[in-house]
Amino acid sequence: LEQDTFQLTVGQYVHQFYPGVNTTTFGVNGPYLGPTLLMHRGDTARLKVINELPQVTSMHWHGMHVPGDMDGGPQREVQPGADWDVKFQVDNPAGTYWYHPHPHMLTASQATKGIAGMIIVRDAEEEALDLPRAYGVDDFPVVVQDRRFLANGSMPTAPYGDSVLVNGTPHAYLDCPAQVVRLRLLNGANARVFDLGFENGTEMHVITGDGGLLNAPVTTERLRLSNGERYEVLLDLSGLEGDSLLLMSFGSELPQTVPGSNNLVWESSALNGIDFPVLRIRVTAPTPEPVTVLPTTLSAAAPWEEALSVRTRTKILTGNGMVGMGMFMINGQMFDIDVINDTMQLGSVEIWNISNNSNMAHPMHIHGVSFFVLDRNGVPPPLWEQGAKDVVLVDAGETVRLIMRFGHPTAGWPYMYHCHNLLHEDNMMMLQFIVEEMTVGTPEQLAAAPISFHPNPTAGIVVFQSTDPLKEVTLHDMSGRLLIRIDLLGSTQGSLDLDHLPPGPYLARITGKGSSTVRIIMRE
């Protein structure tokens, strides 16, 4: 769907995944899964979620940078027979995002039954590249799930399934033209991690992570996709008309700590620890105006400088259990809808250290932001993982460092961070945070601050003063790009000239002896 207002009706259906076998499902505007929503950065998205289910639901816009009141977490319930009007500015770069239910203790069951759909965001940077983007022609959604079907056709909520579905279809195939094509991969499974690659070793050229374009395509024969993660890959099928390729998941290559391996202690499945087919690609004739050349560069997006971080938080994952059950905690805490676990300042940059002391890998998701993976146990992540993300798989015994900026306020409704194994999430491996707007300019506050800035907001010149000697001041835009650097040489005061900069927020960092202070400066 590409329109001004999206109407998403969530309902109960009877659907046949296999001929003659009826299965009760939940779907969005149809029996299983929902429409792909096409949005453009800078536009205003308007959505109406209508609940025709016999139970409460909610809808989360996974990966989208939206205020807390529009995020659709477990607090934002939509009762049976009710609806929810959603409105937000599309603030994400071009990429693949998705929507799914998020009611507490019902997320896994509703997602299992079929409530989910993709969101594709386009922007000027992506549109300037020669990439496949004809939806359903050379640009394809690929939602990968596993589901368990009982003899009576029912589809229970389970950590693992024995049937693989792609876009809701078992034994799926896809007709692709003999040219460069684009696959938008999404792991929509409850718990299984897919280790994707082609049976014949065909290379995939990764162009995005969860949150937008990489700097350049990354060529690989394997791509590990954990729950909620997305990657866009290009395949060069030029000259292969009439051939077919088989996309596989190489479960035999998964570590014992990763759901989907052959770990015999956990729940069993016929697919665990084996290599199994996911999707057959049948190569057809090229289109009249094919993309035939792989790009060499994509985007200049980069992580924020670590020096901009105002705080480092440590999140320790603990507990033991099964893939579908157990008691797993974050910093010794479990979800309580009445407890706010963290408070952040709007516009601030933070580093999170996530250490996994539990017995299995957890795909960790943070609402409302994109982050960059700085390192895994001190080692830089693989190239395809160096773009913006919102889900990261943290293996047992591993510490992953992330950097992120909180760009939207809570607006009265907390954001979540949690394990995206949906059964762990429902079992309360989830905490809440709020993002508070910073007050930037009352004379009383400025006078009381150890380092004062005035006027703030400013029409051009902002003056700063400290009681202690200062070394330097730097000014950055909100993406972390350095704009101004001034050596202060022990002075206790100085000024920044923002007259040449466009209106908006900026980050000023003042460094003294053994300490530093970061403030948001508003240019009017």
Regions found by a protein language model. Give the residues of each.
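Histidine-centered copper-binding motifs that mark active-site loops
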Residues: L1-L234, P255, L264-N320, V392, ...
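A glycine-anchored, Pro-Gly-centered beta-turn/N-cap motif
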Residues: G95, Q179, S348, W413, ...
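Short, surface-exposed ligand- or partner-binding patches at beta-edge/loop junctions that are enriched
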Residues: Y97-H102, S238-L254, P409-N421
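Edge beta-strands of extracellular beta-sandwich domains
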Residues: T257-S261, M430-F433, S516-R523
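C-terminal outer-membrane/trafficking sorting elements
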Residues: P443-E524
